[in-house]
Amino acid sequence: MGKIWVLHGPNLNLLGRREPDKYGTQTLDEINNELLHKAHTAGIPIQVEQTNFEGELIQWIHSMGPDDFLIINPGAWTHYSYAVRDAITSVQVPTIEVHLSNIHAREEFRKTSVIAPVCCGQISGLGGKSYSLALDYALEALTQK
């Protein structure tokens, strides 16, 4: 059975104090703890990481196995990182892109995702619930294999 990876991109370490009107007051630790608890309860291995360095994120993606599942919030890399997109394509694992805020209702430059076309889905605008819903899907997908 594969592992679920949850990768958080740049500035997400500041959740809870960074623009709470857009991202809410829930901290990254609170989100991660909910995800860890849910996955452990289901008996599915999970690894959760956050980085502000694009190369580090890409290395984690490269280390994924063929039976793994990726939940990723690429942060600002969503809009321009073809390197992250290519990394996801190269490992060919099912991927869901998540965002706390509704990127389609924000500034024009945020409405474009270069990551979404290589994902099986995108969930945005539901705060921390975006991650929880993505995890529900990943758990179902892994237990049906």
UniProtKB/Swiss-Prot annotation:
Record-annotated membrane-spanning stretches: none
Tagged with keyword Cell membrane: no
InterPro entries documented for this protein: DHquinase_II (IPR001874), DHquinase_II_CS (IPR018509), DHquinase_II_sf (IPR036441)
EC number: 4.2.1.10
SUPFAM superfamilies recorded: Type II 3-dehydroquinate dehydratase
Site positions (Transition state stabilizer): 18
Metabolic or biological pathway, per its Swiss-Prot or TrEMBL entry: Metabolic intermediate biosynthesis; chorismate biosynthesis; chorismate from D-erythrose 4-phosphate and phosphoenolpyruvate: step 3/7
Active site: 23, 99
Record-level Gene Ontology MF annotations: 3-dehydroquinate dehydratase activity
Residues binding substrate: 73, 79, 86, 100-101, 110
GO biological process: amino acid biosynthetic process; aromatic amino acid family biosynthetic process; chorismate biosynthetic process; quinate catabolic process
Keyword tRNA-binding found: no
Top EC class of this enzyme: lyase
Keywords: Amino-acid biosynthesis, Aromatic amino acid biosynthesis, Lyase
Catalytic activity entry: 3-dehydroquinate = 3-dehydroshikimate + H2O
Family under the similarity heading: Belongs to the type-II 3-dehydroquinase family.
Record function comment: Catalyzes a trans-dehydration via an enolate intermediate.
Complexes and interactors: Homododecamer.
UniProt-recorded name of the protein: 3-dehydroquinate dehydratase
